[in-house]
Amino acid sequence: MIGRIAGTLLEKNPPHLLVDCHGVGYEIDVPMSTFYNLPAIGHPVTLLTQQIVREDAHLLFGFATATERNTFRELIKITGVGARMALAVLSGLSVPELAQAVTMQEAGRLTKIPGIGKKTAERLLLELKGKLGADLGHAPGATPLADSAVDILNALLALGYSEKEAAQAIKQVPAGTGVSDGIKLALKALSKG
């Protein structure tokens, strides 16, 4: 199994890459979240990978983070979700956005992704519940923070907090709070321990 590729980026044409690793060119498909963070052609690149071997093909998928790769692995375990659909999900939603959609049971967010219908979205919500790490949920009846929760989560992750710590702190932020104030409140909650 190929778990990581480090080499020189030779080509990039969404979602396909060609990475030269000591004279061997590896064709790798990546989600758009990884694609947008790639260096320029000719520069070094390192990707975590998932290799899928089928009767008719050997496929290699690349990811910028372990969280993305782990989410991809969870997605392809779901009946009816293949590697291409999993890649589409990760291209349409970031991992924190997907975790929030699962926690809030927002099938509508998933059906906006090309190739995902209502039944598939509902299956994804059911199968992924409790498997994505960051629990961005709120108490029943509480108003969700919506997209600001994702921005707050990303800020806390960038500051070095774990997904679990960040998610717990976000629960302390009242609904309707802006991103800037939400970050301050979450940091205050984290400092109280």
UniProtKB/Swiss-Prot annotation:
Mostly located where?
Answer: cytoplasm
Chain positions covered by the region annotation Domain III? 151-193
Chain spans, region Domain I: 1-64
- What keyword terms does UniProt attach to this protein? Cytoplasm, DNA damage, DNA recombination, DNA repair, DNA-binding
Q: From the UniProt entry, list the residue stretches annotated as the region Flexible linker.
A: 145-151
Recorded GO cellular component terms are: cytoplasm; Holliday junction helicase complex; Holliday junction resolvase complex
Could you confirm whether the keyword DNA-binding appears in this record? yes
Localization of this protein = Cytoplasm
Q: Where is this region: Domain II?
A: 65-144
Q: Name one GO biological process term.
A: DNA repair
Q: Which GO terms describe its molecular function?
A: ATP binding; four-way junction DNA binding; four-way junction helicase activity
| Record-linked CDD domains | UBA_RuvA_C (cd14332)
Pfam families documented for this protein: HHH_5, RuvA_C, RuvA_N
Q: Which InterPro entries did the record assign?
A: DNA_helicase_Holl-junc_RuvA_I, Hlx-hairpin-Hlx_DNA-bd_motif, NA-bd_OB-fold, RuvA, RuvA_2-like, RuvA_C, RuvA_C_sf
Q: What does this protein do?
A: The RuvA-RuvB-RuvC complex processes Holliday junction (HJ) DNA during genetic recombination and DNA repair, while the RuvA-RuvB complex plays an important role in the rescue of blocked DNA replication forks via replication fork reversal (RFR). RuvA specifically binds to HJ cruciform DNA, conferring on it an open structure. The RuvB hexamer acts as an ATP-dependent pump, pulling dsDNA into and through the RuvAB complex. HJ branch migration allows RuvC to scan DNA until it finds its consensus sequence, where it cleaves and resolves the cruciform DNA.
Assembly, per entry: Homotetramer. Forms an RuvA(8)-RuvB(12)-Holliday junction (HJ) complex. HJ DNA is sandwiched between 2 RuvA tetramers; dsDNA enters through RuvA and exits via RuvB. An RuvB hexamer assembles on each DNA strand where it exits the tetramer. Each RuvB hexamer is contacted by two RuvA subunits (via domain III) on 2 adjacent RuvB subunits; this complex drives branch migration. In the full resolvosome a probable DNA-RuvA(4)-RuvB(12)-RuvC(2) complex forms which resolves the HJ.
Q: Which family does it belong to?
A: Belongs to the RuvA family.
Record text about domains: Has three domains with a flexible linker between the domains II and III and assumes an 'L' shape. Domain III is highly mobile and contacts RuvB.
Name of the featured protein:
Holliday junction branch migration complex subunit RuvA
Identify the species of origin. Answer: Cupriavidus metallidurans (strain ATCC 43123 / DSM 2839 / NBRC 102507 / CH34) (Ralstonia metallidurans)
